[in-house]
Design a protein with these regions (language model features):
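Active-site and adjacent substrate-binding regions of carbohydrate-active enzymes
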Residues: 1-583, 587-618
């Protein structure tokens, strides 16, 4: 062990009792735990001086990632700049965008044609060759650190590619490797699993198991080439934790734990959100606090709010530092399609009731599809809206099948028998910018751009870290060329994963273009957010009655400052507001109001209203 009183020993001592208790609760294996501790110390010893210095700074400032000026962007390395060196060369553009949190989509080695967009990893310590090398990743991380940009990377925990060395050895029958996965010699147990385990991809990859050429059966909850890891085996947890720390030591600031609710399997359950998952998440949090305390864990939990919040853990025993605000994202698009903010109001009331320590990543679009995980029992009780029919309406609206819809999207995993499908498309295309530009209609284009900016204003109004999907800052449209790619044509998510069009992005500098209007609109919003204390993570936030179901009203307070945010989700002019007297100033355009009980909002428009200094609250 490290010498007495060393930094490592001090951190380990703080967590050792709980860490050992949880580890032995799962594994009852002293030898594996001893190896685990040795691995942690070895990983700490391999951490270079600049990272250890950053660890010390962030330990002294544990809320560093809760600043209101944090702005994220997620992107694919190849689509954005070709390779990692190209991304490094484009850091000035990211700084122009105001980005100081950069999430690189999966870039570790994965087989061509069987990669699931990089989520089928065949080597956790090798970068996909066409994207660069591990040295290039470390060089980019160093450059980001100097530029004040935190770097995030995905860590695929639930499964490996069938081409991973462990999987190849398991297939060949090498001792100790079948036990790293879920192998069976007959369908008896797999059929029992499938009685209770929901299918992830019922259309494109039905079932949860795959039979190999040699007759063996292996668990594959996602795609047949992604073999689920068995975390009941302590060597799997030990080795995957070591891989995570290897990546952390390359200079990453945030590690996204992909599909974390799925990582523990138990016969007779749905194999989702089991108690052991939280034990593993808690141990990973302690591992980071011991070895690399400047590194944050971002949990990918794409589920309803009641199942998301537990992944924060508790103040005494935290798990993930941050989680995605998935339900609010999906509810936002529902609200745009219906023109009614009632469900979004209910959703935000639930979010506002959570402890302020809980930090969400807020977003409109990402690399993935939009799944319609809404509060259907409430919709049915309140509006007699039924799940299957409503999902069809939403998908029809956003794929332009509904009369009058300006949206241009495509369906993903369409399952007519189940009455279910998910949605793909960029923000600009779903807001109608693509259709209006194609039609050459300046009036429609102005409305669509306004809608796009309003949705971003809504995202920026929420507590947490706002994250933009690369290209949205300049109104990137859908990329339909994936239809011509045999490796991608079956996956409509590539509709919004196309190459960044640098030529069109240059139009952000030309006044009057929609690219310039979107880019400058978003930069103005981001600058206002960074400078206004009401957007602090610790601000008091509540939803208020706007007097109109089409308009959502959000009130943020910090000290004696108050900001009222109004959002019109309908395509009509609306008069709405909150019960306030006294002077208010609209931050985006500078309009002054003596009262905001009823102000005019443009179709799909918004207002950020700051109470004037000295004005009295009604």
């Amino acid at each position: 062990m490290a010498k007495k009183n060393s930094v490592f020993s001090r951190r380990l001592e703080r967590h050792l009792d709980e860490l050992k208790w949880l580890y032995q609760e799962l594994y009852h294996d002293e030898h594996s735990f001893s190896y685990f501790l040795e691995m942690l110390e070895r990983s700490w010893g391999e951490r270079k001086r600049p990272l250890r210095d950053q660890d010390a700074r962030r330990e002294a400032d544990p809320d560093w990632y809760r600043r209101r000026d944090l702005l994220g962007m997620m992107l694919y390395v190849d689509a954005f700049a070709g390779n990692l060196k190209g991304v490094k060369g484009r850091l000035p553009y990211l700084q122009e965008c105001g980005v100081n949190y950069l999430h690189l989509m999966p870039l570790l080695q994965s087989p061509k044609g069987r990669s699931d967009g990089g989520y089928a990893v065949s080597d956790f310590r090798t970068v996909q060759p066409e994207l660069g090398s591990m040295e290039d990743l470390e060089d980019l991380a160093d450059a980001c650190r100097k530029a004040g940009i935190s770097l995030c990377l995905d860590f695929v925990m639930n499964h490996t590619s069938e081409d991973h060395a462990w999987a190849q050895k398991a297939r060949a029958g090498e001792p100790g490797y079948r036990e790293r996965y879920f192998f069976y010699d007959s369908w008896d147990i797999p059929r029992e699993f499938e009685k209770t385990v929901p299918q992830v991809f019922p259309t494109t990859a039905p079932g949860s198991f795959t039979q190999l050429d040699n007759g063996q059966i292996v668990m594959t909850n996602f795609y047949p080439y992604q073999w689920d890891l068995n975390y009941a085996n302590p060597m799997v947890f030990n080795d995957m934790t070591e891989h995570l720390l290897f990546l952390a030591n390359r200079g990453l600031d945030v590690i996204r734990l992909d599909a974390i609710p799925y990582i523990w399997k138990e016969l007779g359950t749905n194999c989702r959100n089991l108690p052991q998952v939280h034990t593993l998440a808690r141990m990973l949090r302690m591992v980071c606090e011991i070895v690399c305390p400047s590194v944050l864990l971002l949990g990918e939990v794409v589920m309803e709010p009641a199942k998301v919040a537990p992944y924060f853990g508790t103040p005494e025993k935290p798990e993930c530092h941050m989680l995605y605000n998935v339900t609010t994202m999906a509810t936002t698009w529902h609200t745009l399609a219906t023109g009614d903010a009632s469900l979004l109001k209910r959703q935000m009331e639930a979010v506002c009731a959570l402890p302020k320590d809980f930090l969400f990543l807020n977003y409109l679009r990402c690399h993935d599809d939009i799944g319609w995980g809404l509060d259907y029992p409430w919709l049915q009780e309140r509006f007699h809206i039924f799940e299957v029919a409503h999902k069809k309406y939403l998908n029809d609206w956003f794929t332009s099948r509904w009369p009058g819809s300006p949206a241009r999207g495509e369906l993903y995993n369409d399952a007519p028998r189940l009455g279910d499908a998910r949605l793909c498309g960029t923000t600009a295309s779903l807001c109608g910018v693509e259709a209006a530009d194609f039609e050459g209609d300046p009036f429609k284009l102005e409305r669509a751009v306004s809608c796009d900016v309003t949705l971003h204003a809504w995202m920026l109004s929420q507590s947490g870290i706002p994250v933009i999907y690369s290209g949205d800052e300049v109104g990137r449209f859908n990329d339909y060329t994936y239809h011509d790619d045999p490796d991608r044509r079956e996956d409509s998510r590539y509709l919004h994963r196309g190459a960044f069009q640098w030529g069109l992005a240059e139009l952000r500098r030309e006044p009057g273009t929609y690219q310039e209007k979107l880019f400058q609109g978003l930069r103005r919003l981001e600058t206002l957010r960074a400078g206004e204390p009401c957007f602090d993570a610790g601000a008091d936030v509540r939803v208020e009655d706007s007097g109109d179901s089409r308009v959502l009203a959000l009130c943020r307070r910090s000290g004696d400052r108050e900001l009222v945010c109004l959002f019109n989700f309908s395509s009509q002019f609306v008069h709405a507001g909150v019960d306030r007297a006294g002077g208010y100033t609209e931050l985006m355009y500078g309009t002054k109001y003596d009262s905001i009980r009823s102000i005019e909002l443009w179709p799909n428009g918004f207002a950020w209203l700051l109470r004037d200094e000295g004005a009295q609250e009604a």
